[in-house]
């Protein structure tokens, strides 16, 4: 696919989703059955309306059955499914119905709350609609078909995705809101996080624990002793996920994360990528100065490359109260961020150090344990 975007001065090639791959392979199957000839490429319209010419990597057909495969090309966005083959079998039927299912390597939903019903193949609504429409257009109105999408590498590749968090077991999902993969875009990632949040809400939860990643997850379960069932990753998208909790009417949010990540939120930085905003030292220096810390400490902290290194200096100087000040600012900033939209959300914060453990919390830990047990 020769379509590009520019990001930070660099040129990146776009690609296409697993949903587009499945639609193209399905169309190739139908064309081979109808023409009784091999098809090396097909033209498909993606879910977003873009027309693409997709190469077909594998072809096999008989009178009323065909198999085709398309290799996933994510462009310069090398995700978990890039390069894998998406296979489709199409069998013509005597009725006019077109049905779609997933086979080997396509995950199955095991929990309520996502856009796929329990027991169904993890083929999301937009690509499902697109695959069915593509086949119907090629077949005409009076013929029917059974479509089976499968991916031999799917179960292994799925280990590198968030599917298990969503209760999708046994393989990958067939995805694609637009059908196009845009490199350096966070939208797909954010959508996955939102899906997990929606699943928790649909299961009846009205309070949620947001963590930046594995460190926070481990600390919640192994140090605080809270249930893993309340935990959802927010990655670097703190503001986005806070807004999502409000949209979904969660009443309480507990953010638990490493101090080096959450300290940024105290200064109103709600996307915590270091490439976008790395003001950790500056925030620490400002808050230490307000507490009356000596210039020598401020200068030493400013030179630290990590909050772990700064933490050692802060502890030696006896200014650990700075952590209490900062967690309260994180809480205040977060609640102010949500202030002008309803419903209201109560936010609490726990932050920790890899070397020093628990640093500070907006409430006593025993009180939080009672609230979140």
UniProtKB/Swiss-Prot annotation:
Q: What is its EC number?
A: 2.1.1.195
Q: Which InterPro entries match?
A: CbiD (IPR002748), CbiD_sf (IPR036074)
Known catalytic reactions: Co-precorrin-5B + S-adenosyl-L-methionine = Co-precorrin-6A + S-adenosyl-L-homocysteine
- Annotated metabolic or biological route of this protein: Cofactor biosynthesis; adenosylcobalamin biosynthesis; cob(II)yrinate a,c-diamide from sirohydrochlorin (anaerobic route): step 6/10
Q: Which GO molecular function annotations are given, in alphabetical order?
A: cobalt-precorrin-5B C1-methyltransferase activity
Cite the entry's keywords alphabetically.
Cobalamin biosynthesis, Methyltransferase, S-adenosyl-L-methionine, Transferase
Where do the coiled-coil regions begin and end?
none
Give the family per the record.
Answer: Belongs to the CbiD family.
Q: What is this protein called?
A: Cobalt-precorrin-5B C(1)-methyltransferase
Q: Which organism is it from?
A: Listeria monocytogenes serotype 4b (strain CLIP80459)
